[in-house]
A protein has these predicted regions:
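Active-site-proximal, substrate-binding regions of enzyme catalytic domains
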Residues: 3-82, 88, 97-99
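Acidic, PIN/NYN-like endoribonuclease modules and their adjacent C-terminal/linker elements
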Residues: 30-32, 91-151
């Protein structure tokens, strides 16, 4: 999970939501540092291939680089991995490695479908008001997918 998702969720006091959706949530040290501390229940694990991280750093931020490098390592080790990434370039790179991805908005839609939240619209509006970037088109699409009517 990248820091933008964690920060966005924390601004609406929902940083533990991913723990309800996944059996375990792993973040690398760079994401923990960008977030500004630990989150109860999250596992902090550094990627072992620092060369891979440094190569990714040529194109991405520290958090996204460590998330993708760690995702590659875990998936090669046989784990079922889904990366939570919002940055478009990071998403493209993760997909090029064959990794499964979802963004913060997708996480909210899944949470509603699973019965953990009542309204994607209300949470996204709160997140946007606190500085979370979500284009009008993505907002509209999220409301549509969450079956919450037109905006």
């Amino acid at each position: 999970m990248d820091a933008s998702c964690l920060i966005g969720l924390s601004k609406v006091q929902m940083e533990t939501l991913p723990l309800q959706l996944y059996t375990k949530v792993i973040i690398p040290p760079a994401v923990q540092a960008e977030f500004g501390g630990a989150v109860e229940g999250y596992i902090v694990q550094p990627p072992s291939n620092r060369v891979h991280v440094q190569t990714l750093r040529l194109m991405l931020g520290a958090g996204e680089s460590e998330v993708i490098a760690l995702g590659v390592e875990l998936s090669q080790g046989g784990e079922q991995v889904e990366m939570v990434l919002d940055d478009l370039q990071a998403r493209r790179i993760a997909l090029s490695y064959g990794l499964r991805i979802v963004g913060t908005v997708g996480l909210l839609i899944r949470a509603k479908q699973s019965g953990y939240i009542e309204s994607v619209r209300a949470i996204l509006q709160q997140m946007r008001a606190s500085g979370f970037r979500c284009s009008p088109e993505l907002f509209r699409r999220a409301i549509e997918l969450a079956q919450e009517g037109d905006d």
